[in-house]
Amino acid sequence: LIKKTPDYHITINMASVRCDGLESAASFADAYNFYPTDGMTLFQRSGDEYFRIMGGWDVTASPGVTAREGMDKLVPVENWRGYCSRSNFAAGATDGGSNAVAGYIFEKMNASAKEGVNDKGNSEGLNEVLYGFKAYKSYFILGDYMVALGAGVTNKRPELDGEIRTTIDQTAWTDEVFSMKREKMELVASGTHSLLSADGTPLWLVQKGKFAYRILPEYTREAFVTCETRPTDWVKRNKVNEKKQGLPSEARILRLWANHGQRPVDDTYGYVVYAGRQIPSDELPFRVLQNDTLVQAVCSMDGKVVEAVLYPGNKGLQAEGLSLSASAPCAVLIREEAGEIVVSVTDACMNAALKGIRIVLNGREIKVPMPQGMLCGKPAVIRVDRMTNQ
């Protein structure tokens, strides 16, 4: 899922079992492509927020990714199929405007382990730090806000070293960083700090000229920020860098993350990133309707935009003033405009036999035909009159 405006670029990358991941080629190119399709979420304004610091990245803290910490345990490999999720559930929906929704069930696997693979590389049996945990991850874009929700975060291998964490961002630290509450800003010093104030309320964390971050404390128990300078090893990341001169010996990094601990079972997280140029308000312009392993959903405060990820086994969404259900697992975006309801739906399992999905919104049935053939899995967008089904 990509949102691009003249001022910023947001990318969210997910790979279900239907897809392969990004290849690694330790002997001659990228050696650490372990996490790019694990829900990686990138926020860019100048375009160089990440590649200028890649040499010093903690790869296990890739932005947007839920993972076990342990950069020192990663072994570079050649893996021509990359990594994906064991689940067939992944979807994104948008009507082409300023809003979007995406979500997937994440439980990492090596794509080379699929049947019929004849180019496995040398990754089999290596890097157990990558595996053994699960999360339901969703993303909601409402204007200049990106909301991320997680549920069912469970460590299935708690005997392995390393806590489970969800990284909010790991980006270039290029300017002053402030914490903000009630529009009062305080400079954040280097080191590690909580993203909650002393009284337990959330703070906005703002990097001057870049993006603003805030956790949703009802879903996030612990979250931290660190401003740090790390040594780089560009050649270790990619052999091609042997031929490059003048690469920086250290990287200044701003990193934010939610911590799930060593033994999470059905843990959650929630955070928001503001990409606009204004000072973000303490009053958020949206509310979370549900965040669990059945439904993850958000709506705008005026109720004109509703976004939901409906997982297998769900019984629909019931919230104050709103009921929503679907006849198949999907991602749904509903937007009101000038006498119409714009409905965007994506089949999350890319079922080629599925001809349509029936949406029931506040008791009203809306039938949405699914794209067929080579367009299977594409968002379907329909417009209906607010008063009739025409």
Show the residue positions of the predicted features.
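Extended polysaccharide-engagement surfaces of secreted carbohydrate-active enzymes
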Residues: 1-354, 360-365, 379, 387
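Solvent-exposed serine/threonine-rich low-complexity stretches and specific carbohydrate-binding patches
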Residues: 366-374
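Mature N-terminal, pre-catalytic/accessory segment of carbohydrate-active enzymes
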Residues: 384-390
